[in-house]
Amino acid sequence: MSPQTETKASVGFKAGVKDYKLTYYTPDYETKDTDILAAFRVSPQPGVPPEEAGAAVAAESSTGTWTTVWTDGLTSLDRYKGRCYHIESVVGEENQYIAYVAYPLDLFEEGSVTNMFTSIVGNVFGFKALRALRLEDLRIPTSYSKTFQGPPHGIQVERDKLNKYGRPLLGCTIKPKLGLSAKNYGRAVYECLRGGLDFTKDDENVNSQPFMRWRDRFLFCAEAIYKAQAETGEIKGHYLNATAGTCEEMIKRAVFARELGAPIVMHDYLTGGFTANTSLAHYCRDNGLLLHIHRAMHAVIDRQKNHGMHFRVLAKALRMSGGDHIHAGTVVGKLEGEREMTLGFVDLLRDDFIEKDRSRGIFFTQDWVSMPGVLPVASGGIHVWHMPALTEIFGDDSVLQFGGGTLGHPWGNAPGAVANRVALEACVQARNEGRDLAREGNEIIREACKWSPELAAACEVWKEIKFEFKPVDTLDL
Protein backbone atom coordinates (compact mmCIF):
# COMPACT_ATOMS: atom_id res chain seq x y z
CA MET A 1 0.00 0.00 0.00
CA SER A 2 1.40 3.40 -0.95
CA PRO A 3 1.76 6.19 1.64
CA GLN A 4 -0.88 8.15 -0.30
CA THR A 5 -3.37 5.27 0.01
CA GLU A 6 -2.64 4.90 3.72
CA THR A 7 -3.38 8.57 4.29
CA LYS A 8 -6.72 8.39 2.45
CA ALA A 9 -7.81 5.28 4.31
CA SER A 10 -7.15 6.87 7.67
CA VAL A 11 -9.20 10.01 7.05
CA GLY A 12 -12.17 10.05 9.49
CA PHE A 13 -11.12 6.77 11.08
CA LYS A 14 -9.41 6.34 14.42
CA ALA A 15 -8.32 2.81 15.25
CA GLY A 16 -8.56 1.44 18.75
CA VAL A 17 -11.06 0.36 21.40
CA LYS A 18 -13.69 2.70 22.82
CA ASP A 19 -16.43 2.26 25.41
CA TYR A 20 -19.63 0.71 24.05
CA LYS A 21 -21.72 3.25 25.93
CA LEU A 22 -20.37 6.08 23.78
CA THR A 23 -22.19 4.63 20.78
CA TYR A 24 -24.83 2.17 21.98
CA TYR A 25 -26.22 3.68 25.20
CA THR A 26 -28.86 6.21 24.14
CA PRO A 27 -31.21 7.03 27.05
CA ASP A 28 -32.92 9.78 25.02
CA TYR A 29 -33.97 7.38 22.25
CA GLU A 30 -37.71 7.19 21.56
CA THR A 31 -38.64 3.68 20.46
CA LYS A 32 -40.40 3.18 17.14
CA ASP A 33 -43.46 1.04 16.44
CA THR A 34 -41.30 -1.02 14.08
CA ASP A 35 -38.51 -1.75 16.60
CA ILE A 36 -38.05 -5.17 18.15
CA LEU A 37 -37.71 -4.45 21.87
CA ALA A 38 -35.85 -6.72 24.28
CA ALA A 39 -35.62 -6.80 28.07
CA PHE A 40 -32.37 -8.39 29.29
CA ARG A 41 -31.52 -9.31 32.88
CA VAL A 42 -27.86 -8.22 33.04
CA SER A 43 -25.36 -9.24 35.73
CA PRO A 44 -22.14 -7.29 35.01
CA GLN A 45 -18.69 -8.33 36.18
CA PRO A 46 -17.41 -6.32 39.17
CA GLY A 47 -16.25 -2.91 38.03
CA VAL A 48 -18.35 -2.85 34.84
CA PRO A 49 -20.90 0.01 34.99
CA PRO A 50 -24.50 -0.98 34.14
CA GLU A 51 -24.58 1.52 31.24
CA GLU A 52 -21.51 -0.10 29.70
CA ALA A 53 -22.96 -3.59 30.23
CA GLY A 54 -26.29 -2.67 28.64
CA ALA A 55 -24.55 -0.95 25.74
CA ALA A 56 -22.32 -3.99 25.24
CA VAL A 57 -25.40 -6.21 24.95
CA ALA A 58 -26.91 -3.85 22.37
CA ALA A 59 -23.66 -3.70 20.41
CA GLU A 60 -22.73 -7.37 20.41
CA SER A 61 -26.27 -8.44 19.45
CA SER A 62 -26.43 -5.99 16.54
CA THR A 63 -23.67 -4.13 14.65
CA GLY A 64 -20.84 -3.88 17.16
CA THR A 65 -17.59 -5.73 17.69
CA TRP A 66 -14.77 -5.42 20.20
CA THR A 67 -12.84 -2.70 18.36
CA THR A 68 -13.48 0.14 15.94
CA VAL A 69 -13.34 -0.99 12.30
CA TRP A 70 -12.88 1.27 9.30
CA THR A 71 -15.80 -0.35 7.41
CA ASP A 72 -18.13 1.33 9.92
CA GLY A 73 -17.78 4.29 7.60
CA LEU A 74 -19.29 2.36 4.69
CA THR A 75 -22.73 2.04 6.30
CA SER A 76 -25.10 4.02 8.50
CA LEU A 77 -24.54 2.74 12.02
CA ASP A 78 -27.14 5.15 13.30
CA ARG A 79 -29.74 3.35 11.20
CA TYR A 80 -28.76 -0.25 11.95
CA LYS A 81 -27.34 -0.37 15.48
CA GLY A 82 -29.15 -1.73 18.50
CA ARG A 83 -29.64 0.82 21.28
CA CYS A 84 -29.78 0.35 25.03
CA TYR A 85 -32.38 2.99 25.85
CA HIS A 86 -33.22 2.29 29.50
CA ILE A 87 -31.71 0.53 32.51
CA GLU A 88 -33.36 -0.26 35.84
CA SER A 89 -32.16 -2.09 38.94
CA VAL A 90 -33.68 -5.47 39.77
CA VAL A 91 -35.59 -5.44 43.06
CA GLY A 92 -33.87 -7.48 45.75
CA GLU A 93 -30.73 -8.19 43.72
CA GLU A 94 -27.30 -6.61 44.06
CA ASN A 95 -25.55 -5.47 40.88
CA GLN A 96 -28.26 -6.84 38.58
CA TYR A 97 -30.22 -4.78 36.08
CA ILE A 98 -32.90 -4.94 33.42
CA ALA A 99 -31.47 -3.42 30.24
CA TYR A 100 -33.94 -2.49 27.51
CA VAL A 101 -32.63 -2.70 23.95
CA ALA A 102 -34.30 -1.56 20.72
CA TYR A 103 -33.37 -3.23 17.41
CA PRO A 104 -34.19 -1.73 14.00
CA LEU A 105 -36.41 -4.03 11.96
CA ASP A 106 -33.98 -4.12 9.03
CA LEU A 107 -31.56 -6.23 11.09
CA PHE A 108 -33.78 -9.30 10.74
CA GLU A 109 -34.83 -11.60 7.90
CA GLU A 110 -38.57 -11.73 7.37
CA GLY A 111 -40.34 -14.84 8.64
CA SER A 112 -37.25 -16.32 10.31
CA VAL A 113 -37.20 -17.05 14.04
CA THR A 114 -33.82 -18.66 13.40
CA ASN A 115 -32.30 -15.39 12.21
CA MET A 116 -33.95 -13.35 14.97
CA PHE A 117 -32.50 -15.56 17.70
CA THR A 118 -29.09 -15.82 16.04
CA SER A 119 -28.74 -12.06 16.49
CA ILE A 120 -30.48 -11.39 19.79
CA VAL A 121 -29.31 -14.45 21.77
CA GLY A 122 -26.12 -15.24 19.87
CA ASN A 123 -22.50 -14.64 20.88
CA VAL A 124 -23.44 -11.92 23.35
CA PHE A 125 -24.38 -14.59 25.92
CA GLY A 126 -20.73 -15.63 26.19
CA PHE A 127 -19.46 -12.07 26.65
CA LYS A 128 -16.76 -11.96 29.36
CA ALA A 129 -17.80 -8.56 30.72
CA LEU A 130 -21.04 -10.16 31.94
CA ARG A 131 -21.31 -12.72 34.73
CA ALA A 132 -24.73 -13.75 33.43
CA LEU A 133 -27.33 -12.62 30.92
CA ARG A 134 -30.97 -13.57 30.48
CA LEU A 135 -33.49 -12.51 27.85
CA GLU A 136 -36.68 -11.87 29.82
CA ASP A 137 -39.05 -10.70 27.09
CA LEU A 138 -39.38 -9.47 23.51
CA ARG A 139 -41.82 -7.05 21.91
CA ILE A 140 -42.50 -8.25 18.37
CA PRO A 141 -43.78 -5.35 16.24
CA THR A 142 -46.76 -5.99 14.00
CA SER A 143 -44.64 -5.14 10.96
CA TYR A 144 -42.47 -8.17 11.80
CA SER A 145 -45.09 -10.60 13.12
CA LYS A 146 -47.03 -10.16 9.88
CA THR A 147 -44.14 -11.78 7.99
CA PHE A 148 -44.86 -15.08 9.82
CA GLN A 149 -47.60 -17.60 9.06
CA GLY A 150 -47.94 -18.49 12.74
CA PRO A 151 -49.88 -21.55 13.96
CA PRO A 152 -51.08 -23.85 11.17
CA HIS A 153 -54.72 -23.51 12.23
CA GLY A 154 -55.31 -22.00 15.67
CA ILE A 155 -57.80 -22.56 18.46
CA GLN A 156 -61.12 -21.93 16.70
CA VAL A 157 -60.26 -23.98 13.62
CA GLU A 158 -59.14 -26.87 15.83
CA ARG A 159 -62.41 -26.84 17.76
CA ASP A 160 -64.34 -26.83 14.49
CA LYS A 161 -62.29 -29.76 13.17
CA LEU A 162 -62.88 -31.75 16.36
CA ASN A 163 -66.46 -30.54 16.93
CA LYS A 164 -65.67 -30.05 20.63
CA TYR A 165 -66.65 -26.89 22.48
CA GLY A 166 -67.14 -25.52 25.98
CA ARG A 167 -64.48 -27.49 27.83
CA PRO A 168 -60.74 -28.18 27.90
CA LEU A 169 -59.54 -31.04 25.71
CA LEU A 170 -58.27 -34.19 27.42
CA GLY A 171 -55.08 -36.00 26.51
CA CYS A 172 -52.71 -38.68 27.71
CA THR A 173 -49.06 -39.51 27.06
CA ILE A 174 -48.59 -43.23 26.51
CA LYS A 175 -46.35 -44.81 29.16
CA PRO A 176 -43.86 -46.33 29.51
CA LYS A 177 -42.47 -43.76 27.12
CA LEU A 178 -39.92 -46.20 25.67
CA GLY A 179 -39.85 -49.96 25.22
CA LEU A 180 -43.36 -50.91 24.03
CA SER A 181 -43.85 -52.70 20.74
CA ALA A 182 -45.93 -50.89 18.12
CA LYS A 183 -48.88 -53.26 18.59
CA ASN A 184 -48.98 -52.92 22.38
CA TYR A 185 -48.55 -49.19 21.99
CA GLY A 186 -51.55 -49.03 19.66
CA ARG A 187 -53.57 -51.08 22.13
CA ALA A 188 -52.89 -48.54 24.89
CA VAL A 189 -53.88 -45.71 22.53
CA TYR A 190 -57.20 -47.42 21.75
CA GLU A 191 -58.02 -48.09 25.41
CA CYS A 192 -57.39 -44.46 26.41
CA LEU A 193 -59.38 -43.00 23.51
CA ARG A 194 -62.20 -45.49 24.02
CA GLY A 195 -62.39 -44.49 27.68
CA GLY A 196 -63.17 -40.88 26.84
CA LEU A 197 -59.97 -38.96 26.05
CA ASP A 198 -59.78 -36.68 23.02
CA PHE A 199 -56.10 -37.29 22.32
CA THR A 200 -53.26 -39.60 23.13
CA LYS A 201 -49.64 -38.67 22.61
CA ASP A 202 -46.21 -39.94 21.69
CA ASP A 203 -43.68 -38.95 24.30
CA GLU A 204 -41.07 -36.47 23.13
CA ASN A 205 -38.31 -39.06 22.79
CA VAL A 206 -40.41 -41.56 20.84
CA ASN A 207 -39.09 -41.21 17.30
CA SER A 208 -38.04 -44.38 15.45
CA GLN A 209 -36.08 -46.72 17.70
CA PRO A 210 -35.26 -50.41 17.22
CA PHE A 211 -38.09 -51.57 19.52
CA MET A 212 -40.71 -49.54 17.60
CA ARG A 213 -40.14 -48.05 14.16
CA TRP A 214 -42.15 -44.95 13.29
CA ARG A 215 -44.12 -46.45 10.41
CA ASP A 216 -45.33 -49.39 12.50
CA ARG A 217 -46.36 -47.04 15.31
CA PHE A 218 -48.25 -44.77 12.92
CA LEU A 219 -50.18 -47.72 11.46
CA PHE A 220 -51.24 -49.22 14.80
CA CYS A 221 -52.16 -45.79 16.20
CA ALA A 222 -54.28 -45.01 13.13
CA GLU A 223 -56.13 -48.31 13.61
CA ALA A 224 -56.71 -47.41 17.27
CA ILE A 225 -58.05 -43.96 16.35
CA TYR A 226 -60.54 -45.28 13.80
CA LYS A 227 -61.76 -48.04 16.11
CA ALA A 228 -62.26 -45.63 19.03
CA GLN A 229 -64.04 -43.11 16.81
CA ALA A 230 -66.42 -45.76 15.52
CA GLU A 231 -67.30 -46.90 19.03
CA THR A 232 -67.67 -43.48 20.68
CA GLY A 233 -68.98 -41.28 17.88
CA GLU A 234 -66.35 -38.66 18.81
CA ILE A 235 -63.42 -37.40 16.76
CA LYS A 236 -60.16 -38.70 18.24
CA GLY A 237 -56.48 -38.08 17.60
CA HIS A 238 -53.00 -39.24 18.51
CA TYR A 239 -49.98 -36.91 18.39
CA LEU A 240 -47.77 -38.78 15.94
CA ASN A 241 -44.24 -37.53 16.61
CA ALA A 242 -42.71 -36.61 13.25
CA THR A 243 -39.45 -35.34 14.78
CA ALA A 244 -36.51 -36.86 12.92
CA GLY A 245 -32.80 -36.47 12.21
CA THR A 246 -33.37 -34.50 9.00
CA CYS A 247 -36.05 -32.12 7.74
CA GLU A 248 -36.65 -34.41 4.78
CA GLU A 249 -37.35 -37.40 7.02
CA MET A 250 -39.59 -35.28 9.25
CA ILE A 251 -41.73 -34.19 6.31
CA LYS A 252 -41.86 -37.79 5.03
CA ARG A 253 -43.37 -38.88 8.35
CA ALA A 254 -45.89 -36.03 8.29
CA VAL A 255 -46.89 -37.01 4.74
CA PHE A 256 -47.50 -40.60 5.86
CA ALA A 257 -49.60 -39.40 8.81
CA ARG A 258 -51.72 -37.36 6.41
CA GLU A 259 -52.13 -40.35 4.08
CA LEU A 260 -53.43 -42.38 7.04
CA GLY A 261 -56.01 -39.68 7.74
CA ALA A 262 -54.50 -38.71 11.10
CA PRO A 263 -55.72 -35.31 12.34
CA ILE A 264 -52.55 -34.23 14.15
CA VAL A 265 -48.77 -34.66 14.20
CA MET A 266 -46.17 -33.60 16.73
CA HIS A 267 -42.75 -31.95 16.79
CA ASP A 268 -40.05 -31.32 19.42
CA TYR A 269 -39.44 -27.73 18.38
CA LEU A 270 -36.31 -26.91 20.39
CA THR A 271 -34.34 -30.09 19.77
CA GLY A 272 -35.64 -30.19 16.19
CA GLY A 273 -34.87 -26.53 15.57
CA PHE A 274 -36.88 -23.52 14.45
CA THR A 275 -36.15 -23.97 10.76
CA ALA A 276 -37.49 -27.52 10.86
CA ASN A 277 -40.47 -26.44 12.95
CA THR A 278 -41.48 -23.64 10.61
CA SER A 279 -41.17 -25.98 7.62
CA LEU A 280 -43.43 -28.53 9.31
CA ALA A 281 -45.95 -25.83 10.32
CA HIS A 282 -46.21 -24.69 6.70
CA TYR A 283 -46.78 -28.29 5.58
CA CYS A 284 -49.46 -28.77 8.25
CA ARG A 285 -51.41 -25.68 7.19
CA ASP A 286 -51.24 -26.63 3.53
CA ASN A 287 -52.44 -30.17 4.26
CA GLY A 288 -54.97 -29.77 7.07
CA LEU A 289 -52.92 -31.30 9.89
CA LEU A 290 -52.94 -29.93 13.42
CA LEU A 291 -49.49 -29.54 15.00
CA HIS A 292 -48.72 -30.38 18.62
CA ILE A 293 -45.46 -28.94 19.98
CA HIS A 294 -43.36 -30.38 22.76
CA ARG A 295 -40.80 -28.14 24.47
CA ALA A 296 -38.17 -30.78 25.31
CA MET A 297 -34.89 -29.03 26.29
CA HIS A 298 -36.63 -25.81 27.36
CA ALA A 299 -35.49 -26.04 30.99
CA VAL A 300 -31.85 -26.11 29.85
CA ILE A 301 -32.52 -22.65 28.42
CA ASP A 302 -35.15 -21.08 30.67
CA ARG A 303 -35.09 -22.50 34.20
CA GLN A 304 -32.21 -20.54 35.75
CA LYS A 305 -33.29 -17.07 36.77
CA ASN A 306 -30.04 -15.26 35.97
CA HIS A 307 -28.93 -16.74 32.66
CA GLY A 308 -30.59 -18.00 29.50
CA MET A 309 -33.96 -17.07 28.12
CA HIS A 310 -37.39 -17.00 29.75
CA PHE A 311 -40.05 -19.36 28.44
CA ARG A 312 -42.32 -16.43 27.57
CA VAL A 313 -39.79 -15.62 24.81
CA LEU A 314 -39.77 -19.23 23.62
CA ALA A 315 -43.58 -19.17 23.65
CA LYS A 316 -43.70 -16.05 21.47
CA ALA A 317 -41.15 -17.59 19.11
CA LEU A 318 -43.25 -20.75 18.83
CA ARG A 319 -46.39 -18.77 18.04
CA MET A 320 -44.51 -17.13 15.17
CA SER A 321 -42.79 -20.31 13.98
CA GLY A 322 -46.01 -22.31 14.14
CA GLY A 323 -47.78 -24.77 16.42
CA ASP A 324 -51.38 -25.41 17.50
CA HIS A 325 -50.52 -26.78 20.97
CA ILE A 326 -47.50 -26.27 23.21
CA HIS A 327 -46.64 -27.61 26.65
CA ALA A 328 -46.80 -24.75 29.14
CA GLY A 329 -46.40 -26.25 32.61
CA THR A 330 -49.16 -27.10 35.07
CA VAL A 331 -48.68 -24.85 38.14
CA VAL A 332 -49.97 -27.76 40.28
CA GLY A 333 -48.02 -30.74 38.87
CA LYS A 334 -44.44 -32.00 39.02
CA LEU A 335 -42.88 -29.43 36.66
CA GLU A 336 -41.61 -25.89 37.28
CA GLY A 337 -44.15 -23.06 36.96
CA GLU A 338 -45.30 -20.20 39.20
CA ARG A 339 -49.00 -19.40 38.78
CA GLU A 340 -48.95 -15.71 37.76
CA MET A 341 -45.91 -16.17 35.55
CA THR A 342 -47.48 -19.20 33.84
CA LEU A 343 -50.74 -17.34 33.24
CA GLY A 344 -48.74 -14.51 31.72
CA PHE A 345 -47.23 -16.59 28.96
CA VAL A 346 -50.46 -18.58 28.54
CA ASP A 347 -52.11 -15.29 27.59
CA LEU A 348 -49.23 -14.54 25.22
CA LEU A 349 -49.97 -17.86 23.51
CA ARG A 350 -53.75 -17.54 23.28
CA ASP A 351 -54.79 -13.91 23.21
CA ASP A 352 -54.71 -11.39 20.38
CA PHE A 353 -53.65 -8.38 22.47
CA ILE A 354 -51.76 -8.57 25.78
CA GLU A 355 -51.09 -5.51 27.92
CA LYS A 356 -47.80 -4.93 29.72
CA ASP A 357 -48.12 -6.37 33.24
CA ARG A 358 -44.95 -6.73 35.29
CA SER A 359 -46.89 -8.52 38.06
CA ARG A 360 -47.17 -11.44 35.61
CA GLY A 361 -43.72 -10.97 34.07
CA ILE A 362 -44.94 -9.28 30.88
CA PHE A 363 -42.49 -6.48 30.08
CA PHE A 364 -44.11 -5.21 26.87
CA THR A 365 -47.56 -4.79 25.37
CA GLN A 366 -47.88 -7.35 22.56
CA ASP A 367 -50.29 -7.06 19.63
CA TRP A 368 -50.52 -10.22 17.51
CA VAL A 369 -52.87 -8.56 14.98
CA SER A 370 -55.12 -11.61 14.58
CA MET A 371 -52.36 -14.23 14.36
CA PRO A 372 -54.04 -17.53 15.39
CA GLY A 373 -53.63 -18.55 19.01
CA VAL A 374 -51.95 -21.63 20.50
CA LEU A 375 -53.59 -24.00 22.99
CA PRO A 376 -51.48 -24.33 26.16
CA VAL A 377 -50.97 -27.92 27.28
CA ALA A 378 -50.85 -28.76 30.99
CA SER A 379 -48.92 -31.98 31.41
CA GLY A 380 -46.63 -33.51 34.01
CA GLY A 381 -47.53 -35.13 37.33
CA ILE A 382 -51.24 -34.28 37.28
CA HIS A 383 -54.17 -36.48 38.35
CA VAL A 384 -57.91 -36.28 39.05
CA TRP A 385 -57.55 -34.30 42.29
CA HIS A 386 -55.89 -31.55 40.23
CA MET A 387 -58.81 -31.29 37.79
CA PRO A 388 -60.68 -28.43 39.55
CA ALA A 389 -57.52 -26.32 39.81
CA LEU A 390 -56.50 -27.02 36.21
CA THR A 391 -59.97 -26.16 34.91
CA GLU A 392 -59.97 -22.93 36.92
CA ILE A 393 -56.39 -21.92 36.01
CA PHE A 394 -56.32 -22.75 32.30
CA GLY A 395 -59.97 -22.37 31.31
CA ASP A 396 -61.64 -23.99 28.32
CA ASP A 397 -58.99 -23.21 25.69
CA SER A 398 -56.39 -25.68 26.89
CA VAL A 399 -55.36 -29.32 26.72
CA LEU A 400 -55.06 -31.25 30.00
CA GLN A 401 -52.83 -34.31 29.65
CA PHE A 402 -52.77 -37.09 32.22
CA GLY A 403 -50.13 -39.70 31.38
CA GLY A 404 -49.44 -41.54 34.62
CA GLY A 405 -52.76 -40.11 35.81
CA THR A 406 -54.51 -42.27 33.20
CA LEU A 407 -52.33 -45.33 32.68
CA GLY A 408 -51.60 -45.61 36.41
CA HIS A 409 -55.25 -46.32 37.26
CA PRO A 410 -55.52 -49.55 39.29
CA TRP A 411 -58.14 -50.98 36.91
CA GLY A 412 -56.32 -50.24 33.66
CA ASN A 413 -56.06 -47.67 30.90
CA ALA A 414 -59.71 -47.35 29.86
CA PRO A 415 -60.99 -46.87 33.44
CA GLY A 416 -58.23 -44.30 33.93
CA ALA A 417 -59.52 -42.37 30.92
CA VAL A 418 -63.10 -42.66 32.21
CA ALA A 419 -62.04 -41.24 35.58
CA ASN A 420 -60.43 -38.20 33.98
CA ARG A 421 -63.36 -37.55 31.64
CA VAL A 422 -65.88 -37.79 34.49
CA ALA A 423 -63.77 -35.47 36.67
CA LEU A 424 -63.51 -32.92 33.86
CA GLU A 425 -67.21 -33.01 33.01
CA ALA A 426 -68.08 -32.63 36.70
CA CYS A 427 -65.79 -29.60 37.07
CA VAL A 428 -67.09 -27.92 33.91
CA GLN A 429 -70.71 -28.47 34.97
CA ALA A 430 -70.03 -27.13 38.46
CA ARG A 431 -68.29 -24.06 37.05
CA ASN A 432 -71.17 -23.42 34.65
CA GLU A 433 -73.57 -23.63 37.58
CA GLY A 434 -71.62 -20.88 39.33
CA ARG A 435 -69.73 -22.95 41.87
CA ASP A 436 -66.23 -21.89 42.98
CA LEU A 437 -63.75 -24.50 41.73
CA ALA A 438 -60.90 -23.11 43.82
CA ARG A 439 -62.86 -23.43 47.07
CA GLU A 440 -65.19 -26.36 46.35
CA GLY A 441 -62.99 -28.45 44.05
CA ASN A 442 -62.45 -31.43 46.33
CA GLU A 443 -66.14 -31.56 47.21
CA ILE A 444 -67.08 -31.53 43.51
CA ILE A 445 -64.76 -34.47 42.83
CA ARG A 446 -66.11 -36.43 45.83
CA GLU A 447 -69.69 -35.91 44.64
CA ALA A 448 -68.78 -37.27 41.20
CA CYS A 449 -67.16 -40.32 42.82
CA LYS A 450 -70.59 -41.42 44.07
CA TRP A 451 -71.73 -42.33 40.55
CA SER A 452 -68.35 -43.16 38.97
CA PRO A 453 -66.50 -46.09 40.53
CA GLU A 454 -63.60 -45.46 38.11
CA LEU A 455 -63.16 -41.94 39.52
CA ALA A 456 -63.51 -43.18 43.09
CA ALA A 457 -60.71 -45.71 42.54
CA ALA A 458 -58.47 -43.04 41.00
CA CYS A 459 -59.11 -40.66 43.90
CA GLU A 460 -58.14 -43.33 46.38
CA VAL A 461 -54.84 -44.09 44.60
CA TRP A 462 -53.67 -40.47 44.27
CA LYS A 463 -55.11 -38.88 47.41
CA GLU A 464 -51.66 -38.43 49.00
CA ILE A 465 -49.65 -37.42 45.91
CA LYS A 466 -48.29 -33.86 46.03
CA PHE A 467 -45.36 -32.01 44.45
CA GLU A 468 -44.69 -29.21 46.93
CA PHE A 469 -41.41 -27.60 45.91
CA LYS A 470 -40.72 -23.89 45.55
CA PRO A 471 -40.18 -22.78 41.94
CA VAL A 472 -36.65 -21.74 40.96
CA ASP A 473 -37.75 -19.04 38.52
CA THR A 474 -39.86 -16.43 40.32
CA LEU A 475 -41.15 -12.93 39.64
CA ASP A 476 -39.21 -9.88 40.89
CA LEU A 477 -41.67 -8.40 43.39
From Swiss-Prot:
Key words of the record: Acetylation, Calvin cycle, Carbon dioxide fixation, Chloroplast, Disulfide bond, Lyase, Magnesium, Metal-binding, Methylation, Monooxygenase, Oxidoreductase, Photorespiration, Photosynthesis, Plastid
Post-translational modification, as annotated: The disulfide bond which can form in the large chain dimeric partners within the hexadecamer appears to be associated with oxidative stress and protein turnover.
UniProt-annotated binding residues for substrate: 123, 173, 177, 295, 327, 379
N6-carboxylysine modifications at: 201
Propeptide: 1-2
Highest taxon of source: Eukaryota
Pfam family for this entry, one: RuBisCO_large_N
Modified residues (N6,N6,N6-trimethyllysine): 14
Main localisation: plastid
Record has Transcription regulation as a keyword: no
Any one of the GO BP annotations: reductive pentose-phosphate cycle
Entry's Gene Ontology molecular function annotations: magnesium ion binding; monooxygenase activity; ribulose-bisphosphate carboxylase activity
Active site: 175, 294
Subunit structure: Heterohexadecamer of 8 large chains and 8 small chains; disulfide-linked. The disulfide link is formed within the large subunit homodimers.
Function: RuBisCO catalyzes two reactions: the carboxylation of D-ribulose 1,5-bisphosphate, the primary event in carbon dioxide fixation, as well as the oxidative fragmentation of the pentose substrate in the photorespiration process. Both reactions occur simultaneously and in competition at the same active site.
Note: The basic functional RuBisCO is composed of a large chain homodimer in a 'head-to-tail' conformation. In form I RuBisCO this homodimer is arranged in a barrel-like tetramer with the small subunits forming a tetrameric 'cap' on each end of the 'barrel'.
Record-stated family: Belongs to the RuBisCO large chain family. Type I subfamily.
Name this protein carries in UniProt: Ribulose bisphosphate carboxylase large chain
Organism: Dioscorea elephantipes (Elephant's foot yam)
Lineage: Eukaryota, Viridiplantae, Streptophyta, Embryophyta, Tracheophyta
Gene name per UniProt: rbcL
